[in-house]
């Protein structure tokens, strides 16, 4: 695919590329493959169950968009919906902030701290 434009959606914690990753780790634009990068800055602590929930939600959103043109707008909509879903996982306590991250900016709200009754 020569001179193809790389379509992408980038939110704080979700990046989607209309591309494949080649053997050298480079993105190669594609109209057939979407590549998902979750939490590229390692801002959160993840478990396998939470990651699988994100992947399933991504698959669900892509399936709901099947038949629509592959555009920046459609990718941004999927990315935005995934970002909101990630926030819901944080609010439910299924993921947590990584306090050892390079930067702790609490971009989805301050951490919840359980207080014991005395």
Curated annotation (Swiss-Prot):
Signal peptide: none
Role played: NDH-1 shuttles electrons from an unknown electron donor, via FMN and iron-sulfur (Fe-S) centers, to quinones in the respiratory and/or the photosynthetic chain. The immediate electron acceptor for the enzyme in this species is believed to be plastoquinone. Couples the redox reaction to proton translocation, and thus conserves the redox energy in a proton gradient. Cyanobacterial NDH-1 also plays a role in inorganic carbon-concentration.
Official protein name in the record: NAD(P)H-quinone oxidoreductase subunit M
Assigned EC number: 7.1.1.-
The reaction(s) this protein catalyses: a plastoquinone + NADH + (n+1) H(+)(in) = a plastoquinol + NAD(+) + n H(+)(out); a plastoquinone + NADPH + (n+1) H(+)(in) = a plastoquinol + NADP(+) + n H(+)(out)
Pfam assignment, any one: NdhM
Entry's family note: Belongs to the complex I NdhM subunit family.
UniProt keyword list: Membrane, NAD, NADP, Plastoquinone, Quinone, Thylakoid, Translocase, Transport
Compartmental location: Cellular thylakoid membrane
Subunit structure: NDH-1 can be composed of about 15 different subunits; different subcomplexes with different compositions have been identified which probably have different functions.
Designated gene of the protein: ndhM
Topological category with respect to the lipid bilayer: Peripheral membrane protein
GO cellular component terms listed in the entry, alphabetical order: plasma membrane-derived thylakoid membrane
GO MF terms, alphabetically ordered: oxidoreductase activity, acting on NAD(P)H, quinone or similar compound as acceptor; quinone binding
Main location: membrane
């Amino acid at each position: 695919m020569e001179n193809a434009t790389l379509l992408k959606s980038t939110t704080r914690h979700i990046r989607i590329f209309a591309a494949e990753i080649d053997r050298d780790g480079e993105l190669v634009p594609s109209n057939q493959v979407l590549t998902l990068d979750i939490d590229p800055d390692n801002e959160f602590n993840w478990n396998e169950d939470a990651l699988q929930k994100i992947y399933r939600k991504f698959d669900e959103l892509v399936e709901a968009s099947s038949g629509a043109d592959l555009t920046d707008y459609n990718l941004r909509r999927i990315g935005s919906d995934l970002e909101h879903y990630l926030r819901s996982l944080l609010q439910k306590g299924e993921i947590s902030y990584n306090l050892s991250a390079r930067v702790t900016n609490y971009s989805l709200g301050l951490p919840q701290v359980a207080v014991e009754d005395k």
